[in-house]
C-alpha cells in the first residue's frame, strides 16, 4: 500500500504509559523519539498533559504531565512532530503555552461523544494558541448512532485538523470499521480522519488496513504494540505495510530489540485470553487488567470460564 497522504502517529509512550504509570526513564524516551524520528514517523506522542490536581506526580511519571522542560530533554526539532494528549475534564486551561514557545505541534483531545461540547471548547482554546488539534472520540463501540452523528456534525463545524475513530475496547470487526470509516469521512469533509485500534481480538492491524482502504489517512501505532491491556496496532507493521520510501523500519526494529522485548515480558501487554474476552464482549479492560494482575501476584483469579461469565453480567460504559 502506498498513498503519500497517509501519516503514522506513534503513541508508544502515551498509551504504553497506561501499563507502567508513565515511568519511562528520560534516556529511554530520548532514544525512542530519536529512533522514531529516524524511521520517518510523522507524529510522536510523548504522553498526556494532565492536571496535577487530578494526578499526583508522586504516583505518576513525567509523561503523564509532559511539562515543556521534560519534553525538550527528550525531543528535538525535526520533520517528526511532537503530539500530546489531553483528557476532557482533566486538563488545566492555563497549562498551555503559545505554540510558538512550545516544542509540541499537536494536542489530541480525548473525549466521549456525550462530552463533545466540552471537547470542542477545549480544542478551540488550544487552537487559538496556534496548535494543530485532533479530537479522538473514545469508546465508539458504546455510542448510539444518533449521538455519534450529532458529535460528528458538531466537529465538522470546527477548524480542527483531525478527528479519530477509536476502538477503545478492541471490539470492532472489519464490517464495522468500514461502515464507521465511511461515516466519519462523509460527515467530516476537509478534515483528516484517523484510526486507533486495540488488539484484543488480534484485529488491530487488519482493522487499520480496512480504515486505510476506505480513505483514513492518519494511523495510530505503537512500538511492539505497547499499550493498555491487549495493546495497539504495531508501528513496525505499519512502516512495513505502507511502502512509503520516507519510512525506514530499521530504527524501530533496533528499539524493539533493545527495550521492548524485555518490557513486554515485565508488563505483559498483548494478546491474552482475558483481554480477548473483554474485547468480544465490548467491555472496558479494567476487569481483565485486574484479572491479569491477580494472576501475576499469585492471587485467586478464577478460571477463564468464570471470568467470562462474570463479564457477561457487567454493564459499564466507562
What are these regions (language model features)?
Residues 1-318:
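Catalytic cores and adjacent flexible loops of soluble metabolic enzymes
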